[in-house]
From Swiss-Prot:
Its main location: cytoplasm. GO terms for cellular component: cytosol. Residues 115-174 have a biased composition (Basic and acidic residues). Residues 1-242 are annotated as: Disordered. CDD domains: IF2_eIF5B, IF2_mtIF2_II, mtIF2_IVc. Residues 376-383 are annotated as: G1. Residues 401-405 are annotated as: G2. This is Translation initiation factor IF-2. Residues 367-538 form the tr-type G domain. It comes from Nitrobacter winogradskyi (strain ATCC 25391 / DSM 10237 / CIP 104748 / NCIMB 11846 / Nb-255). One of its GO terms (molecular function) is guanosine tetraphosphate binding. The gene is infB. One of the essential components for the initiation of protein synthesis. Protects formylmethionyl-tRNA from spontaneous hydrolysis and promotes its binding to the 30S ribosomal subunits. Also involved in the hydrolysis of GTP during the formation of the 70S ribosomal complex. InterPro entries: EF-G-like_DII, EFTu-like_2, IF2_assoc_dom_bac, IF2_II, IF2_N, P-loop_NTPase, Small_GTP-bd, T_Tr_GTP-bd_dom. The keyword Zinc does not apply.
Length: 871
């Protein structure tokens, strides 16, 4: 290769005095423009030269050889074709290129092949991208079409609504005679169109053009300077004066049609409503729910009537009321029926509908076990008989060997294999309520009578309870193993109370048994099963449970516990239950054997855990569907309970006998007590016994009575009223005992109810006023009256009867009238002070603070004895 150097070639060199630069292609200059009114403006003018690629040409081409611009433009835009052979050397450069070798050719061929492969790969990628873009565009197109369809449907709906509104307006106008007047045809007038203003020149010469019309050039790097086109100014709004004017042009213009405002449409609607209200309205008959008491305003709202009309009707009946007054259900029903409405009477007690006594389906009824209550007099062997049947020993666990709770047990008959539920009731006089409760929930009563004791008062009471409950009886004549037993005497005594056994021609079954020797127990169970078969006891076990609370207590570790006898349905863990004013969810079920069970069927006694508070014994238990229903029932019952308590303690005027009894209780002394018991039944018995102790002078005042242990709040209450605390089979906790000791509050514990009643009776007897008894000592007659200076008047007397003692009480009697009562201060015989003067002797006597004594008066001497009373 030969390198040649021409003298005309420019050299590229690096020197310390010069920089590496390119020649500028743009020449700049300034031009001053002159405008009217003496204004001038200096404008920068650029002169841009054409950039040439290649060698320097000696001079510009002649005009004849140059091609037009339109012919050169496509050639300039077309891309240069790839040369298969190397390009020829530039003319005049003096460079000679060598020929390519075979290796270079093959390398270039492989490079071209690789370029083709890459181009093909890029083409496939571009096609895939185009296909993906097309699919995306298709989805977007479908979405746009769906949106367009929804928009059209919405427009169609709006159009239909507008059409319906327009038809309604036309119909309203037609009904009320408000037809719109047709607009008068517009007069055809010839208008002269204004000549368009002359167009402003786009550009002016440099010597006379306006500065605002001169185009501005924006130079961007790499491109020519382009003029910037200013945006067209927005049309100015018409002046405020001309905006409200109605001209011929605006009237004929379709774009400036005035639409009706919302306010005018609202006013027009109000006018139409006003006209429509003048028409007579149709009477709407409603079903009005009327409770037991309702205000006039609420009644008017439920009838959709005016309260004034209701008050006017009441005035016609002679009653003056305000809208806030409460009227009874009968008056509200009368008013509603006169106004043409139907009445539905409801009461607050409706929340209890459907809880009990729901009729069962005959297909779901199944046989159930009998419930047997054991009743009788105290110490006649009721619990011992049950122990013999259950093969247990409950008597040894009872305090004092007497039953003070209701117990419920299940026994399996050895002959038939059927289960029998036994309920053991106390036989003492204090437990009347327990026996009555046991008789209500039972199917059969076993009356236990001791063969050596006969019929006793509680035996008669049990007979009356069984007759009141209308349940059959089986007479169990117990203790036949004793030598003094006389069963025939028992049968004879029962005849006096209209109980005739089979051996005497009656229908009552009697069995002679011995609980101690377990004699004839199988025969007793057989008679119970036979009697149950005759009763044909059946129930539905698949329905929600119903039962009765036999006993309730507050256990410190387990909370409120209720002994429940399930009578219908099945009670399960998790059921929501209601008993009296208490509710809860069943947390656990414990059988009579102490085992935890998941469910309890009909005639099964269980202990239920989960109540919010201990219910009262005798309350009926029911399972409800949800807690909301349970809260409704319990709130109603609690409200009724509060109302009954308020009515019993209120000062309302009653009969004359009640007023007299209230006057007697004014001066009565109260013995304040706080009583806590283990179960509800024992608490009832204690309260009943203490209530019977009260007299017109003293009575037990029960400040608080509850089930559970003695707490610190009980001690605080007792301190405020100076009361005593009695715990029956319960104990005080550590804090309560410490507080009672600190404040001097007496806490007494009892396990036998009779000991409790006796101690309270003695304490109440101490509040009674003692009885004063007078004992006559003797009489003395005044013979003479002496006046002694230091002593006063002294009466000289002779004792006519009995004796006279110094310090005794005396009465001065004059003409058979008592004129003074006092004490004898001085008793002298001759001049000596003596303690006593016998009959027939003379003595001198002086009274305390009294000196009006006369001859012939009689002095009566007596002694007053104080005798303590008891209840």
């Amino acid at each position: 290769m030969v390198d040649t150097k021409n003298p005309g070639d420019k050299t590229l060199s690096v020197s310390p005095t010069k920089t590496l630069t390119l020649k500028p292609r743009v020449e700049q200059g300034t031009v001053r423009q002159s405008f009217s009114h003496g204004r001038t403006k200096q404008v920068v003018v650029e002169k841009r030269g054409k950039r040439r690629i290649g060698g320097d040409s000696p001079g510009p081409e002649p005009a004849g050889t140059s091609e037009p611009a339109s012919a050169r433009t496509p050639a300039a835009k077309a891309p240069p074709a790839r040369a298969a052979t190397p390009a020829a050397p530039r003319a005049g450069s003096g460079v000679v290129l060598r020929k390519l070798t075979e290796d270079e050719r093959s390398a270039r061929a492989s490079a071209l092949a690789e370029a083709k492969v890459r181009a093909e790969e890029e083409r496939r990628i571009a096609e895939a991208e185009a296909a993906r873009r097309n699919s995306k565009e298709g989805i977007e197109q479908a979405e746009r079409e769906a949106a367009e369809a929804r928009r059209k449907a919405e427009e169609e709906r709006h159009r239909q609504e507008e059409e319906a509104k327009r038809k309604a307006e036309i119909e309203a106008k037609r009904r009320f005679g408000q037809t719109e007047s047709k607009p008068a045809p517009a007069k055809t007038t010839t208008t002269t169109t204004r000549a368009a203003p002359p167009a402003r020149p786009a550009a002016v010469a440099a010597d006379g053009s306006d500065e605002d019309e001169a185009p501005r050039l924006v130079r961007r790097p790499g491109g020519p300077a382009r003029p910037v086109i200013a945006p067209k100014p927005a049309a100015k709004p018409a002046p405020a004066k001309q905006r409200g004017r109605l001209t011929l042009v605006t009237a004929l213009s379709a774009d400036d049609v005035r639409e009706r405002s919302i306010a005018s449409f609202r006013r027009r609607t109000q006018r139409l409503k006003g006209h429509a209200s003048n028409e007579p309205k149709e009477k709407l008959v409603r079903e009005v729910v009327v409770p037991e008491a309702i205000t006039i305003q609420e009644l008017a709202n439920r009838m959709a009537e005016r309260a004034v009309d209701v008050i006017r009707m009441l005035m016609k009946q002679g009653a003056m009321h305000k809208i806030t007054d409460v009227i009874d259900a009968d008056t509200a029903q009368l008013i509603a029926e006169e106004l043409g409405h139907t009445v539905k009477r409801v009461a607050a007690s409706d929340v209890e509908e459907g809880l009990f006594d729901v009729v069962d389906n005959s297909t779901d009824i199944e046989p159930r076990s009998p419930v047997v209550t054991v009743m009788g007099h105290v110490d006649h062997g009721k619990t011992s008989l049950l122990d013999a049947l259950r093969h247990a020993n409950v008597v040894s666990g009872e305090a004092g060997g007497i039953t003070q709770h209701i117990g419920a047990y299940q026994v399996t008959s050895p002959e038939s294999g059927k289960k029998i539920t036994f309920i053991d009731t106390p036989g003492h006089a204090a437990f009347t309520a327990m026996r009555a409760r046991g008789a209500k929930v039972t199917d059969l009563v076993i009356l236990v009578v001791a063969a050596d004791d006969g019929v006793m008062p509680q035996t008669i009471e049990a007979i009356n309870h069984a007759k009141a409950a209308k349940v059959p009886m089986i007479i169990a004549i117990n203790k036949i193993d004793k030598p003094e037993a006389k069963p025939e005497r028992v049968r004879t005594e029962l005849l006096q109370h209209e109980v005739q056994v089979e051996s005497m021609g009656g229908q009552v079954v009697d069995v002679e048994v011995s609980a101690k020797n377990k004699t004839n127990l199988d025969k007793l169970l057989e008679m119970i099963s036979l009697q149950a078969d005759l009763l044909d006891l059946k129930t539905n076990a698949s329905r929600p449970a119903e039962g009765t609370v036999i006993e309730a207590k507050l256990d410190r570790g387990r909370g409120p516990v209720a002994t429940v006898l399930v009578q219908r349905g099945t009670l399960r863990v998790g059921d929501i239950i209601v008993a009296g004013a208490e509710m809860g969810r069943v947390r656990a079920l414990i059988s009579d054997q102490g085992e935890t069970v998941n469910e309890a069927g009909p005639s099964v006694p269980v202990e239920v855990l989960g109540f919010n508070g201990p219910p009262e014994a005798g309350d009926r238990l029911a399972v409800v569907e949800n807690e909301a229903r349970a809260r409704q029932v319990t709130s109603y019952r609690a409200h009724q309970k509060r109302e009954n308590a308020a009515a019993s303690t209120s000062g309302m005027r009653g009969s004359l006998e009640q007023m007299m009894s209230q006057l007697k209780t004014v001066g009565r002394k109260d013995f304040p007590l706080i009583i806590k018991a283990d179960v509800q039944g024992s608490l009832e018995a204690i309260l009943g016994s203490l209530e019977k102790l009260g007299t017109d002078e003293v009575a037990a005042r029960i400040l608080h009575a509850g089930v559970g242990g003695i707490s610190e709040s009980d001690v605080t209450l007792a301190e405020g009223f100076n009361a005593a605390i009695i715990g029956f089979s319960v104990r005080a906790n550590k804090e309560a005992a410490a507080a009672a000791k600190r404040n001097g509050i007496e806490i007494r514990y009892y396990n036998i109810i009779y000991d409790l009643v006796d101690d309270v009776k003695k304490a109440m007897s101490g509040l009674l006023a003692p009885t004063l008894r007078e004992t006559m000592l003797g009489n003395a007659e005044i013979l003479e009256v002496f006046n002694i200076s230091k002593v006063g008047k002294v009466a000289g007397c002779r004792v006519t009867d009995g004796s006279v003692e110094r310090g005794a009480n005396v009465r001065l009697i004059r003409d058979n009238v008592v004129v003074h009562e006092g004490k004898l201060s001085t008793l002298k015989r001759f001049k000596d002070e003596v303690k006593e003067v016998q009959s027939g002797q003379e003595c001198g006597m002086a009274f305390e603070s009294y000196g009006d004594m006369r001859v012939g008066d009689v002095i009566e001497c007596y002694r007053v004895e104080t005798i303590q009373r008891s209840l």
